[in-house]
Amino acid sequence: MPKEFKQHTGIAVPLDASNVDTDAIIPKQFLQKVTRIGFGQHLFHEWRFLDDEGKQPNPDFVLNYPRYQGASILLARENFGCGSSREHAPWALDDYGIRVIIAPSFADIFYGNSLNNQMLPIRLSDEEVEELFQFVNANEGATITVDLETQRVSANNKVYSFEIDPFRRHCLLNGLDNIGLTLQHEAKIAEYESNIPAFLR
């Protein structure tokens, strides 16, 4: 079921890398599944693990640091989600527990896929993202609050405003995916179908 997104506060994990592509987010060998569940265990597989089986965590990768366990907000650098257009990338992030990604820029297809899957990608300036990186790196357990209704990010007694398409915002606030949007017009659809001549049914 789609999740309503109004306000979220969570631990932020700083992934200090630019041009993170979808193959790094979820490698191609894990794309056989046809449901959205179970991809989180393979998120950033090549970086998170030292072995192909995913049994030896890489202690030097930021998502494996004890201080960032349970993180639900991902900080990244520019052009996050570039590469192929696989929708499995936001599936993997969502299944891992990420609700928000904050970066200076995103690949267009990844940005749209994230919103379609009720995950919020937020664009802030390079300077604002750098401030958040410094805050999170310097403060263990640091949290960030995202308020979609006011379109603001709050951290370290500072507030950052972000833009989002009004229609996308409406869908997130109300937990609407494509099916949910269609069901909003269920009565009109039923009325239309009832007026279709019998020979066309």
Curated annotation (Swiss-Prot):
It holds the Pfam family Aconitase_C. InterPro entries: 3-IsopropMal_deHydase_ssu, Aconitase/3IPM_dehydase_swvl, AconitaseA/IPMdHydase_ssu_swvl, IPMI_Swivel, LeuD. Its EC number is 4.2.1.33. Keywords: Amino-acid biosynthesis, Branched-chain amino acid biosynthesis, Leucine biosynthesis, Lyase. SUPFAM superfamilies: LeuD/IlvD-like. One of its GO terms (cellular component) is 3-isopropylmalate dehydratase complex. Belongs to the LeuD family. LeuD type 1 subfamily. Heterodimer of LeuC and LeuD. NCBIfam families: leuD, PRK01641.1. This is 3-isopropylmalate dehydratase small subunit. The lineage of its organism: Bacteria, Pseudomonadati, Pseudomonadota, Gammaproteobacteria, Pasteurellales. The gene is leuD.
